[in-house]
Every structure is written in C-alpha cells, then in structure tokens.
C-alpha cells in the first residue's frame, strides 16, 4: 500500500497530462509544505455495464480503447452495430461522452473500408481515452513521439510503420487528433496542430525535399542526415554538411548520384532562407535530368551562402564534370566557351555559389535565347531569299531583264558606232 501522504506527489509525477505533471519545483514546494496546487483527481474510466469485445468483457473505457486500437477492423464493425448503440445508452453514465461517440459514429456513416474503419476507430479511441495516445491501424503513438517513431522505423527499415506514420499526417488524422484535444480544452496544442497541418502539405508532394524524408527531419530537429555519403559523419547540423560531402568526394571520387532525397530534405528543413524555387525545379524534373542537377547544386549553394567560409574544391570539381551537359543547352558557341572556362575557374576555387550562378543566370539564358531567335529569323529570311532567287519565275524575269539590258547596250553601241563612222 502507498502511504496516504505520498499519494498526491506520486499522482502528480505520474500524471498522463503533461500540463498537470509535477516538476522538480512542484516536488520541492510539496516537501516544504508550500505547494499551491494539487494533482487533479484521476479520471474515472469505469462503465456502468460491461461491453464484450473479442470474447472479453470490458468495464473501463480506457482498456476498451486499447483493445480497439489493436484490433481496429473488428472494432469498427462493433462500433457500427446495434448492440454497441444499445450499450452506449445503457452502459455509460457520462452523457457528454455518449454524445461525442454518437456524433463520431454518425459522421462516419458511408465511409466503410480500411480508411473509413481506421479513422472511425481512431476517433472513438481518442474520445474514450482522451489522455491516451493516438491509435491508428495497430500503431499506438503520442503525436509528440511520432518523430521518434518515424526515425526508429527509418533506421530499422520498417516500411509498415513508415507508411502508417505517413498516412497519419497525409490524411490529416494527426491534425484531427489535435483538434479534438483542443475542443476538449487543450489550447496549448494549437501550435502543434498548425505544425502538423504544415507537415500534411509537405508529405503531399512527392519530389525531393518533401515527402516522408522532409517529415522525418522536421519532426526530429537534431536528427543527423541519413544520406549514405554522410551517414558515418553524424551531420546533425547544416554547418557540417558541405565539409562531409567534400571529404566523401575526396575519398570516393564522386557522390554516386547528385539528386539525393535525404540531403534535399535535410537542407530544406534546416536552411534559414527559402528554397522553394530549387525544390520546385527538383519536383518537376527527373533525378538524372540537367535541370534537376542544377536545382540540387542550387540547394548546396544555398548552404554555402549561409556558411560562406566553407569552400568545397573536391565537391565542386565533381559537380563541374556532372554538369557538363548543361553547357550544351546554350546555343551560342562563344557563350558555351566562356561558360566552360568559368566553370573550370569555380572548380578550382570550390565556389558552389559561382557555379550555380553561372548555370542559372536568367539574363544570360534570355540573351542566348534572344540571339538564337534572331539567328533563326536571319536564317529564315536568307533561305526565303535563296528560294526566290532560284525560282523559275525569277530566272525567267532575270533573263528578260538581261535581254533588255543587252539590247539597250547594243543599241547604244550601234548608235555610237554609226555616229562615229559618219563623223569620220
């Protein structure tokens, strides 16, 4: 038995509600007899009548929610049954909980199937166990622990858990969980709710810099980059990324592939400025395309711009080789030569910013396009003129004109000759 005097501090330290849980200061004030607040009474989860689920009777909504979370398909079937509706009105004395559960079940009508069943069970479990974790398709996790769950799943290669966490965010189930808590008075969760809505937008994009990788780094701000080239360097800060990549290229000769989803997501989640343009270019290009490689170079250049003392000669030299096909997109031969020379310069210096600016300068691209358009017009005009000169009509007209000129010249010569003869 726990002594009566210790019940209050034990209840406070073990409280499921983070806001109600005692801190060290609370414990100190309790021991000094100056504590001004007490732990809230433990909520009574008992039911008036038992409910049977999977051959077992439950007299506690929290225990029932736990069982529902594990066997969610069977739970959804029972929740939609007449037997459960009867128990709901006879077995629960909490009228507010009855009203909430009725609303959840009614609103789920017509949404059968795995997704509908999972959402129904998740919402019911949250209502029955408001202080408990989120339960979805057998996964039980507190939303503030979702980042750790995802990190562990990625580390272990647990694809099933990765898919479940992604669904929780993508389908708005995590956001709904927060909203449900906010309605019940947890106004402190407003910021977390907004954060998960932002994550929902990230996971809906499939391109590099988004998806589950972006969620992984957003939920774990101190997680090191999981990209293979830097996996052994423990790059948890953006400051350490470029030196690690440069060292890897120095040792291995290349990164293997330039467009890396983990590196893109790591940069996007840690960088101070906006990288929307680079991410958009990555999303609308294939990973092996020149456009995608230039966009990835732009992300790395953003990092170098933030830490300008970090020159990367090995990485930049490799990038210059990778981006040689980008020079071919320019039409002017002299411009291609100048860009190639500039790229060789930045390769030696390790200037990623200069490399990106050289290949993404909109003014140079526009000037080159304008020059090509002018050259096309001049070529078209020249071909049209050649065609006109070679046409039968022009040849006949030229001959007629020649005949007239020849006749005129002959007439002049004849006239001059005649005058000369008679004058002589």
Give the positions of each predicted feature:
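ADP-ribosyltransferase catalytic core
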Residues: 98-122
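Regulatory extensions appended to serine/threonine kinase catalytic cores
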Residues: 36-103, 125-133, 138-151, 155, ...
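Terminal low-complexity "docking" segments
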Residues: 15-16, 58, 79, 392-396
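Activation segment of ePK-like protein kinases, specifically the conserved APE
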Residues: 18-19, 32-39
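Long, charged low-complexity terminal regions
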Residues: 144-402, 421
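Conserved C-terminal C-lobe helix
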Residues: 2-16
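Juxtamembrane boundary at the C-terminal end of a transmembrane helix
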Residues: 417-424
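A conserved short helix/loop substructure at the end of the activation segment
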Residues: 14-27
């Amino acid at each position: 038995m726990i002594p009566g005097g210790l019940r209050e501090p034990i209840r406070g330290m073990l409280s499921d509600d983070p806001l109600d849980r005692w801190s060290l200061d609370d414990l100190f004030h309790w021991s000094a007899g100056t504590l001004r607040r007490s732990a809230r009474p433990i909520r009574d989860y008992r039911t008036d009548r038992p409910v049977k689920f999977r051959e077992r009777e439950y007299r506690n909504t929290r225990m029932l929610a736990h069982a529902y979370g594990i066997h969610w398909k069977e739970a959804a079937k029972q929740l939609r049954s007449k037997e459960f509706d009867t128990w709901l009105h006879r077995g629960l004395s909490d009228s507010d909980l009855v009203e909430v559960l009725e609303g959840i079940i009614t609103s789920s009508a017509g949404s059968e199937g795995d997704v509908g069943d999972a959402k129904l069970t998740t919402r019911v479990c949250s209502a029955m166990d408001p202080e408990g974790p989120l339960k979805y398709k057998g996964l039980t996790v507190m939303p503030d622990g979702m980042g750790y769950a995802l990190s562990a799943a990625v580390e272990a290669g647990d694809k099933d858990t990765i898919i479940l966490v992604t669904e929780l965010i993508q389908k708005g189930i995590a956001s709904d969980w927060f909203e449900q808590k906010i309605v019940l008075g947890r106004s402190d969760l407003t910021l977390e709710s907004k954060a998960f809505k932002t994550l929902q937008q990230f996971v809906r994009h499939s391109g590099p810099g988004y998806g589950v990788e972006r969620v992984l780094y957003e939920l774990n701000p101190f997680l090191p980059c999981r990209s293979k080239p830097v996996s052994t360097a423990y790059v948890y800060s953006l400051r350490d990324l470029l030196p690690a990549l440069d060292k890897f290229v120095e040792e291995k000769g290349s990164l293997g592939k330039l467009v890396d989803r983990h590196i893109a997501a790591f940069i996007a989640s840690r960088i101070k400025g906006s990288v929307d343009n680079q991410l958009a270019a990555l999303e609308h290009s294939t990973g092996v395309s020149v456009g995608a490689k230039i966009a990835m170079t732009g992300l790395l250049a953003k990092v170098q711009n933030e830490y300008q003392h970090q020159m990367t000669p090995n990485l930049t030299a490799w990038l210059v080789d990778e981006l040689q096909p980008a020079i071919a997109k320019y039409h002017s031969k002299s411009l291609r030569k100048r860009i190639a020379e500039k790229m060789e310069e930045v390769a030696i210096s390790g200037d990623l910013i200069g490399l990106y600016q050289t290949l993404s300068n909109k003014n140079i691209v526009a000037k080159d396009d304008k020059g090509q358009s002018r050259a096309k017009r001049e070529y078209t005009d020249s071909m049209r003129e050649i065609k006109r000169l070679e046409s039968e009509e022009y040849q006949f007209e030229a001959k007629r004109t020649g005949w007239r000129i020849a006749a005129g010249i002959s007439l002049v010569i004849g006239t001059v000759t005649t005058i000369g003869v008679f004058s002589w």
